[in-house]
A protein has these predicted regions:
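C-terminal transmembrane helical hairpin of 12-TM major facilitator-type secondary transporters
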Residues: 271-318
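C-terminal ends and interior cores of transmembrane alpha-helices
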Residues: 77-92, 283-295
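Juxtamembrane intracellular "pre-TM" segments in multi-pass secondary transporters
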Residues: 1-3, 185-213
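Helix-to-loop junctions at the C-terminal end of transmembrane segments
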Residues: 55-68, 154, 260-272, 355-356
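Hydrophobic core of transmembrane alpha-helices in multi-pass small-molecule transporters
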Residues: 14, 95-112, 299-312
Length: 390
């Protein structure tokens, strides 16, 4: 039972990655279809950001009342509906319809993120093995598959409409099939068993280590989200490459993300979280700095990979650190997750408004500043001395 459950969640993580990178790979063409400038695209992306935050909040309601399985089914329908609306809106060159589609897709994606991570923690508890890093790597692999499909579809001249509709159908059917292997009421049962002595939301927010972890997650999730949203357009506008080439370069960022998540497990066990996080931050900062300098396209491509490699560990490491003490893990992980997702979703649209004034490459200096801020708090990911014996 656990093996089928595990495989089903891997597929759901992968499909989530495919869906989001499909949208990112077609953003330059959607922008052209809408005849929108960078500032307008930033506002359009707010639809995705707001929808995702709404989905994150609503997921708690659905999971507590109906369980993770029902939440995943609802999220799959919302993502299908959102992608369909997005495809139609792009074809009609309607900014309003595209924004509405992104809102629906974002709501489904946010809800799915919470539910599938919950299922992952339940599988870990059931089989007594750590599998969440593999699940997150599956998401990254999905983003690479989606980007690769985007390159192929653009090369073949397949329209945005057909591409998005095909992915919408594949996403909905695959997740629907996978839910057959997910137990009923996972999150519902877990919520009902939570002790009354868990840390309150107010107390959790006052914990210095939790605040530091939230700051790291906020900064580095913003770094990752900015790359996802703006690398294709930055390559087209800043380096004057074709739409298909911009997607190839974006795929290099995804390769960096995947590599970081696949190889980090053993390195973290050997050298510790703090050292690995500092190395990751240096990698992201160096990569982004070289991209901004605009030395050459070859240097840019190598730097994009370094950016992805460095950005891969921020979110997973802070969530892992927030869960060190099982007595307070629920609230602390929730705070770190919410901080990260909020920055990842709301930061890039704001960056777009700034880029409309100074250009995307210059706007990336703000992202570089966020990386530096994260570096200040790296000690927070170390396991507390009181727990190191356990």
């Amino acid at each position: 039972m656990e093996l089928k459950w595990y495989k089903a969640i891997i597929v759901i993580f992968t499909m989530s990655g495919i869906s989001i990178s499909t949208w990112f790979s077609r953003t330059p063409e959607v922008r052209d279809l809408l005849q929108a400038n960078t500032g307008t695209m930033g506002l359009i992306l707010l639809g995705l950001s707001v929808g995702s935050i709404v989905g994150l909040v609503l997921s708690n309601v659905f999971v507590r009342k109906k369980g993770g399985r029902v939440a995943i089914v609802i999220s799959a329908f919302l993502m299908f509906l959102g992608f369909t609306t997005l495809a139609i809106g792009s074809t009609l060159s309607s900014i309003f319809v595209v924004t509405a589609g992104l809102f629906l897709f974002g709501a489904g994606s946010g809800m799915c993120n919470v539910a599938m991570n919950l299922e992952g923690t339940e599988i870990e508890y059931s089989i007594k093995k750590t599998i969440l890093p593999i699940l997150h790597a599956s998401f990254s692999i999905g983003t690479l598959i989606g980007a690769g499909a985007g390159i192929l579809f653009i090369h073949l001249g397949i329209s945005v409409l057909i591409h998005l509709l095909a992915i919408a159908l594949l996403l909905f059917l695959s997740i629907l099939i996978c839910t057959r292997f997910i137990p009923h009421g996972t999150g519902k049962d877990q919520h009902e068993k939570l002790p009354d002595t868990v840390e309150s939301s107010q107390t959790a927010w006052l914990n210095k280590r939790t605040i530091s972890l939230a700051m790291i997650a906020l900064c580095l999730a913003f770094v990752e989200g900015s790359a996802n949203d703006w690398i294709p357009l930055a390559m087209v506008d800043g380096y004057q490459v074709s739409h298909s080439m911009s997607t190839v370069i974006y795929a290099l960022f995804l390769c960096g993300m995947i590599s970081g998540r696949l190889i980090s497990g053993r390195l973290i066990d050997r050298f510790g979280r703090v050292l690995l996080l500092r190395v990751a931050i240096l990698s992201a900062a160096a990569g982004l700095f070289l991209v901004i300098l605009k030395i050459s396209l070859v240097v840019c491509m190598i730097s994009i990979f370094l950016w992805g490699l460095g950005a891969s560990l921020g979110f997973p490491l802070t969530i892992s650190a927030a869960g060190d003490d099982s007595r307070y893990a629920v609230k602390r992980v929730s705070i770190v997750t919410l901080s990260g997702y909020t920055a990842s979703l709301s930061g890039p649209p704001i960056l777009g408004l700034l880029a409309n004034q100074v250009g995307l490459l210059h706007a990336f200096i703000f992202v570089l500043f966020a990386i530096c801020i994260a570096g200040i708090f790296t000690k927070a990911v170390a396991k507390p001395h009181s727990l190191q014996a356990h």
